Curated annotation (Swiss-Prot):
Its EC number is 2.7.8.20. It comes from Salmonella dublin (strain CT_02021853). InterPro entries: Alkaline_phosphatase_core_sf, DUF7024, OpgB, OpgB/LTA_synthase_biosynth, Sulfatase_N. GO terms for cellular component: plasma membrane. The keyword Cell inner membrane applies. Keywords: Cell inner membrane, Cell membrane, Membrane, Transferase, Transmembrane, Transmembrane helix. This is Phosphoglycerol transferase I.
Amino acid sequence: MSELLSVALFLASVLIYAWKAGRNTWWFAATLTVLGLFVILNITLYASDYFTGDGINDAVLYTLTNSLTGAGVGKYILPGIGIALALVAVFGALGWVLRRRRHHPHHVGYSLLALLLALGSVDASPAFRQITELVKSQMRDGDPDFAVYYKEPAKTIPNPKLNLVYIYGESLERTYFDNDAFPNLTPELGALKNEGLDFSHTMQLPGTDYTIAGMVASQCGIPLFAPFEGNASASVSSFFPQNICLGDILKNSGYQNYFVQGANLRFAGKDVFLKSHGFDHLYGAEELKTVVADPSYRNDWGFYDDTVLDEAWKKFEALSRSGQRFSLFTLTVDTHHPDGFISRTCNRKRYDYDGKPNQSFSAVSCSQENIAEFINKIKASPWFKDTVIVVSSDHLAMNNTAWKYLNKQDRNNLFFILRGDKPQQETLAVKRNTMDNGATVLDILGGDNFIGLGRSSLSGQSLSEVFLNVKEKVLAMKPDIIRLWNFPKEIKDFTVDRDKNMIAFSGSHFRLPLLLRVSDKRVEPLPESEYSAPLRFQLADFAPRDNFVWIDRCYKMAQLWAPALALSTDWCVSQGQLGGQQTVQHVDKAQWKGKTAFKETVIDVTRYQGNVDTLKIVDNDIRYKADSFIFNVAGAPEEVKQFSGISRPESWGRWSNAQLGDEVKIEYKAPLPKKFDLVITAKAFGDNANRPIPVRVGNEEQTLVLGHDVSTITLHFNNPTDANTLVIAPPAPVSTNEGNILGHSPRKLGIGMVEIKVVNVES
């Protein structure tokens, strides 16, 4: 209703101003600004909804604050371009419409009415309401009900008798199991659901609506609210350190806790969370690649579900045989938005809806088949009688290719339990949320019936039953939940551990690299990983007076304030203000101790803008002084004009990538020498090893032969035509996820370059 009202007010404002208000520059600017704000808010809502399926929520702040890198970004480029073009077009059209009758005399009354209607349209828009609620949740002091309802469970289960298998189905919400809406979509897993305790009304609350948040909610009984933004949890060394979560209780009760997934464990800090709360055995993409049958059988996120669940079965079988009490948690990935992935072992690889194939539905049908096969293996084993199996979605599906059909239904998360010791079939329609999952499991295992804000749905009362406005209530508790982190509010002394790549201050530890925004009462960590914007881009958004401490590889800050370190991959510490003074210190000891020293200085706007402009230079445009092309740092030597066909820098160098260009091309500003040696330090990938690799300069071609290990080879060139471009053409680029960023499409690798040097040998 508010959406229709806001649109009606918007149109009324446009029409009244365009036809009645007349010409006045101030009123035109004010009205266009407010109407433009309405457009921006709604485009922001549309864009956020495209990613989350739930508008502007904490998932947007947490995952999309810094960058979409690592989130299958290629799939969103066209929508992003479309949104940008639409914004430009709408603003242009809006300005043109408002000035249609600019030659008419100005009328203050109609101008004021148009402006008030425009303000009303903004106030009534769902986007403004959502943003306002998020801002309020950041500014509240807390809610007195938090102390009443937050309960810490006993640290042990008195007499544990059952093992636990907990399966998180990525975005596998209960809505998919509605056979009337989606006939025969989930026959195998749906049949298993109907055999157990099926909780049909598991709602999603703020701070529980993406994978790591859903895991925290289900194991700790609290939403994931943190004292920082972005994916900073990937950089912390502990995760809600004061909380007692399900994993802690299981470990204290003698369980060995295992977690198996196909994606990288570091994504969004899952490894940190699990290690902080009782899990000693973690298996992700890196850990599995040496044990799976086919390491090359991967999708954009990691190993397919059939591979992961095969490994989970092996773990279950081995642990059951050992007689050791255990829990085995696993997380699927094939149903990840926007399209999902199809495991090759599925019997059904296609599901049609509305008369055409739908990739997301197909992925769901395939993944549920894999999960059901895993469960049926357990049920058929002699160990099922000692096992509880839990199947839940980590969160509701985000905006995938099935989302518009899901959104027509009453949407709930999936949560059902199969008890080997005590088979029980019942559908429970009690109102609940994902924070209740861990408490319900703990209750079945013989422990307390509460964890944090969660309550057992078998013997307790969920917050979803207590509060009609439970979403608003949880947001009101956000400051209370943030305080559970016990996060430092100041930094004076700090220690950089060069070997462990960590920084410690005020009792907290963070992974490097790291950027800190420091104010009088707050220290905000901003991390860098494959899944966030580079720290220099984040620093460029700081205000001129914002105090910062930046710990990163020296070459990344050298172009600004320490040119002598332009090729150093050591750690450096920079601090200061972008508009004031900055210092750079080289970390030259294993345990390097530093102090913050922020000086009150006069802000130089010109210096600030220069620093910001330099920080925003993209990697390929960075230039440094060197007599060779060093590939493990960003940019290129000053002599290089441009280059293509080369992937991002890694710790050892860079791969050629045929996705970016069929050949490696390095164009120099000036012609290469008439006669020179080309010294190449490199290695080959896959079938490119031990094969002739053409290297061309002008009309002359030499061949390079590389092995899988790094070697240095010198080629001799004559350049009578004064050519200025070096071309290397790997013969057999290999499509692979080797070393790839999680969620990105595979790269096509040919050779790995460490250094290329041109040596003039003209007499």
